[in-house]
Amino acid sequence: MKSTTKLLGKSRPDDASHVELDRTDKAILRALQKDASISNVALAAKVNLSAPACLRRVERLKSLGLIRGIVALLNAPALDAGMVVIIGVVLDRSTPESFAAFEKAAQNVSGCMECHVVTGEFDYFMMLRTRDSESFNRLHAEQLLYLPGVRQIRTFMVLKQVFSTTQIAI
């Protein structure tokens, strides 16, 4: 049975690899990744379509789940979330119940931006943002130590972000 992901109020298959994208669809996606606030008229001009045709294409890309949402990328340091911390987590048991309990709890960790199941010596990597080392120490003592089923946590403080992008190569 294929799993589904809820996006923009619609369900879509997780594997959208069957979707055929032409050159114009790809141009629309590239343009929206660079500036999602672009007006439909400006986007249409950029991809050589009429405004109504462009809007239909964008709506189609949304309904297919290829556009999951429109967001603002915020300045984390200006909002007291300038420190990035990567956390490696090892669970004490490798059971579906342990994984489910951890995953549910991880969603409630303050500042947690991402959580990934990984291969190798860790079961998960979490990426969180916080103000500074003092606020991270507080978060560690108040939340991370109480995550269910955790045997080991290893913390990696990011010293310098070399680059980060939200854009997928199309």
What are these regions (language model features)?
Residues M1-I170:
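A compositional/biophysical signature of low hydrophobicity enriched in polar/charged and small residues
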